[in-house]
């Protein structure tokens, strides 16, 4: 994340019109969601947890301001679940009013979408839904998997693909219309179903690569 911030500042140094510079916001996600801006925690019983919250609102990232962005990233400490749905919901509110601005969301995660410790279909479904709303509004969503087993090369419709890899594909712009919805199978039960839709294509006609692992996250330098 810090190398990405450095790259944004480097590129902004070549943009003379401040109103047209790339702007950056930082959102963290862990436990309960709060609309307060900052880096706050809350207590449940004997444990403290991170809120899911906006840490820094949208602002130009320049050589003069990049340290403020990096310090926010460096201040994040693991404490709580991985409430991806709350993070992406908060990200929806962090978009520029400039109609000509390219909207990009970069979703870093080091684990499974959870409420506690296991994969949560409910959290994953909501997260995919929030991501789809942003994609429908014209945003490009990159997902970066910083966890063991992250494998963007795997076809999410293939056999033996983990829910985590399916989730990372579905959140990203690899699949613009992806959903993960609850469908009733009888009057008393149902299940969550992945529906990826068509794979987006790059300018070269090949499959789009909006889902990346830590090993190829450096490609983000070429996003803008």
Language-model segments: which ranges?
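P/S/T/G-enriched low-complexity
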Residues: 1-224
